[in-house]
Amino acid sequence: MKILFVHQNFPGQYRALAPAVKAAGHEVMAISSRKETDLGGVSNVTYEIKRSSSKSIHPWLVTTESAVIRGEAVHGVVSNLSKNGWTPDVVVGHCGCGEMMFMREALPHARLLGFCEYYYLGKGSDVNFDPEFPSAADAPERCHARNMHLTESLLSCDWGVAPTNWQADLFPENLRSRIKVIHDGIETDRLIPDDNAWIELGRDKVKLKKGDEVVTFINRNLEPMRGYHQFMRALPEIMARRPNARIVIVGGDKVSYGSPPPNASGYKEIFLNEVRERLDMSRIHFVSHVPYPTLVKLLCISAAHVYFTYPFVLSWSML
């Protein structure tokens, strides 16, 4: 069969699946916003955004318009592929960004499988979960509007997939009944204990190995949605109780979810400064982002891995 994967940051959730499908003998191609022509052995076709969002659009529709723009771009790429003789039998794609929105119109006879990562709720999930960071008064309405393109994408699919029961259960019943729970999977051939693992923190020249008191905190970015503020506030007591502990913090100083703080691009320094005077900074290591093999080694030597989150998409670093 000819199988097309669609994800703006391919491979994303399909890092293991796409190569496995190709290895099984199927023709595999990807469409993404990335510029590379080969991603993990899979041919990639780039879609280009040819217009920006409207400046005067209603604020509740900003995400929807962005999704329509992406959907239009992907529709054009898929149509060109078909005109040039490559029409997929199956399309596997993420429903959250609009790329699957017009796939049925472009490929009326293909089987469509949508990835259903998150359905936004005005209450009962991340909205107003943390009283320290209350959501905007119109958050429920924004959530409702934000689901429009996701709902439309899923309705055009033959089936949907969600990685956890909790994520699937966020969807209304008429949509939930279309979704199967199939986790992304864990690379158990790579993510295994290693008693000989060690890392050296380049700037600090500190070598850490299995058996050391290493506490890890890992996220794409250090922000309230993933509990960075709670972790930093716990550090003074953790370090006082464990005078030999080393704290390794992985993550950037931007915002992946929610709003940035006033007059800053990220939250790192805000919550570090809140407790800095009670910390032994020589035992705290902010390493920003690290290569995946280094991340695996770090998890192998970690004595305590701390993971916090609002009720939201489960991070890969948790698993």
Q: What does each model-found stretch correspond to?
A:
Residues 1-43, 161-163:
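N-terminal subdomain of nucleotide-sugar transferases
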Residues 2, 78-97, 103, 111-113, ...:
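Short N-terminal targeting/anchoring amphipathic segment
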Residues 30-81, 85, 273:
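A conserved catalytic-core segment of Leloir-type glycosyltransferases
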Residues 51-61, 109-148, 189-200, 209-210, ...:
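Acceptor-binding helix/loop patch of EC 2.4 sugar-transfer enzymes
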Residues 158, 300-313:
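Acidic donor-binding loop of glycosyltransferase active sites
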Residues 166, 185:
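Carbohydrate-associated surface elements
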Residues 200-226, 232-237, 247-248:
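Conserved donor-binding/catalytic core segment of Leloir-type glycosyltransferases
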Residues 251-255, 259-293:
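Nucleotide-activated donor-binding/catalytic signature segment of Leloir-type glycosyltransferases, i.e.
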